Amino acid sequence: ISTSLNGDPLGISGIFITHAHIGHYAGLMFLGHESAATKSLNVFAMPRMEKFLRNNGPWSQLVDYKNIEILPLADQVWVELSGGIKVKPYQVPHRDEFSETVAFEVKSSKKSVLFLPDIDSWAKWKSEYGHSLQERVAAVDLAFLDATFFDNNELPGRDMSEIPHPRIVETMEVFDNLPESEKDKVYFIHLNHTNPARFFTSSAYKDISERGYKIANSNDRFCLD
């Protein structure tokens, strides 16, 4: 990998971790001795997330072998990066068994983005942390939001209240009465494999599109300049 990318393993200069659920940190294993063997790659993490990585294998080996260097994050404190980019974490309510969960605001001199792939509910974000979804989206140019489930009909035989995520139908209701310019910022991400909105031909996808929202797709690129 290093040779094919001119000595820059993976072409990555840093990674920001939202939380310790499988799809959000497991990829760190590929930075290790058996794979990319990166050297002191910057990994930005909140305090509990950092403790989890340092004290649990195989992640601890990444630290011991200096494949990664963990840099601390703090809630609502900007981190200044090169190129005029800065990142701010916002703690959000989620099933925090092993770590905190955060969203990230990413900002350049020209544009800003909210990246929020996992949250229990928008109401809990307001009641527990004082953040309004509408206000946070109003402050950015693009918003990538948790869209794990379209509605409550996706997991037959399971109590979906035990898997809290704002359903897409609920999130659309939050924005439906706002100007088109606000709805146009919203991209739904993090769709579960059961989510019918994954398919262009589904009624769910059609409903989302007709109401002025978008679903992010693999290989989409969004520039901050």
Predicted regions located by residue number:
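Active-site neighborhood of phospho(di)ester-bond hydrolases with catalytic His/Asp-centered motifs
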Residues: 11-24, 28, 44-46, 115-119, ...
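Short, well-ordered alpha-helix to beta-strand connector turns
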Residues: 12, 40, 65-67, 139-141, ...
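Active-site neighborhood of divalent metal-dependent phosphoester bond hydrolases
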Residues: 35-40, 48-72, 194-196
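Pre-active-site segment of Zn-dependent metallo-hydrolases
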Residues: 1-20, 26-36, 123-136, 171
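Active-site regions of enzymes building and remodeling cell-envelope glycoconjugates
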Residues: 67-70, 86, 210-215
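Short glycine-/acidic-enriched loop or helix-start segments at secondary-structure transitions
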Residues: 26-28, 54-55, 99, 125-126, ...
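Core dinuclear metal-dependent hydrolase active-site scaffold
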Residues: 1-6, 70-136, 220-225
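Cap/insert and terminal regions of metallo-dependent hydrolase folds
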Residues: 112, 120-220
